[in-house]
Amino acid sequence: MIEPARLESVEISRAVRLRLHTADSIEHPASAHVVVPPCALTEAVSSQLHAARRAQVEWSSHPLKQRLKILKSLRQMIAADPRWLASTVDRDNVAETLAAEILPLLDACRFLESEATRILREKQVGNRGRPMWLWGTSVVLRPEPFGVVLIIGPSNYPLLLPGIQALQAITAGNSVLIKPAANCSGTLEALLQLAARAGLPSSVIQLLPESPDAATAVMQQQVDKVVLTGSAATGEAVSRVLADATTPSVMELSGCDAVFVLEDADSELVSNCLLFGLTLNGSRTCMAPRRVFASDHQADEILRLLQAKLARRERQDAAEGPVAEFRDARPSKLAALKIREAISSGAAMLTGFIDTANGQPELHGVAILDRVTSDMSVAQSDLFAPVLSFIRVGSETQALQEYAKCPFTLSATVFGSPQRSQQFARRIDAGCVVINDMIVPTADPRIPFGGRGLSGHGMTRGEAGLLEMIQLKAIVASRRWFKPHLHSPTPADADVMEQLIRLEHARSPFHSLKSIPRMIRATLAQMSFRRNRTLTIGSKDSLNSELRTP
């Protein structure tokens, strides 16, 4: 009979495997890895974890300058032949891979080379803000690595996302275990080959098997931090495993990203950006547009332009040959179900079609829906398929109210005049807001990226992403001789503390000055009590000594 605690652990493990295989909308169901028995897999992962811990101790002792030198060498090797590394990514469009994965990865690497020394240096805290009663206290903030960081990678950007996260982790002095998405080990193996040639010591970065069991096993053996890019369902399952050991994590999860079209927006620009966002990487991008909030006038004009441009793009693609289909049909099937529900509730499907030839509904093409409402499931789901819903609103305030009905708050886009868009962007609850463009500006390596709500927590990339890879240690040095808290209590202590509070926190300098005489009197009384106590104790000790003398 299985004990209740053991049974619960087994069920959690099953849940994680299920989420990593099926509920994570950015992983393929098939896997190229060799199936390893769970016991053997656990032993193999344990060996990798121990090797990572040993490597981390030595790696963290290397000066930061030396670590960054290796990163620079790696960057230059990739730049010398970027097509070779791009060819290892399972994507037909090499130009898109170079633009969406290789170039941002190199930019992030150079950002670390130039900024990591500033970000990771020990900082002496200034005296400003120090309480008066703690004069003489000095504080140094020292960044230290976590230890071993587990990175669970996605399949939509299998090189860029885990690659940047791994580089940030090792820059901070951690070692890294990467669990690749299914069929994505090859590109990361290529990256690690280059890293080894650049001088990265063995076991500082290691690849785990693609099996979800590998991630589960290493989490149960308590890594020091987990960075996950995946669906909200995967994040929920992983969080349960991490809860027992209170392992910290960063989770970049699902999006249902919104586009806000203000009245003074350029409809031509909006339609161009929507077409780009819907078709980039087959719409398998967490920041892809899914909801458009616009007035009737703007919606009509944008829909007219967007449909014409989409039709032109489809004719162009047809003339150039068949477009490769992604192997994972699950996102298309889920999208088809959500679209059908929306149509039955009054939405209109303007482009794309649903095919039922295989017995199950499946979306084909880009689906543009009009007359969608925020309570429809299609506007509240983390779809990983080219689906765009137009939600018509009468005001900016209504747009924000409708937007808030969705639990996903990863990123958003605003179109309008610069000043008005800047003001409106500050009212949006999202981790990142882009103005008058879409997705591409977020490749800037300075920009931190992270979601809120069901879209995750913590940050990746930029300075904030690097700081996620360290834990701060505060080193506090006290004054050498004045430590009144070590004295024995006296009846005057409360008076002294009261006047100290009045002195430091009075409503004006005048009232602070009024507290000074009272503070002096209370302090003198305190000193008098202590002096009298010392004399009394001394007299008693002398008397006892005389009584003991024969």
What are the roles of these predicted feature ranges?
Residues A32-C39, T356, L363-P550:
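Conserved C-terminal structural/oligomerization subdomain of aldehyde/semialdehyde dehydrogenase
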Residues P209, G230, T351-F353, G416:
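Short loop/edge segments at beta-strand edges and connector loops
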Residues P63, R67, C109, G173, ...:
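Residue-level signal for inorganic ion chemistry
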Residues R128-L269, V393:
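Rossmann-like NAD(P) dinucleotide-binding subdomain of oxidoreductase/dehydrogenase enzymes
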Residues P37, R54-S61, L150-I151, F260-V261, ...:
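Short, well-ordered beta-strand elements within core beta-sheets of diverse protein domains
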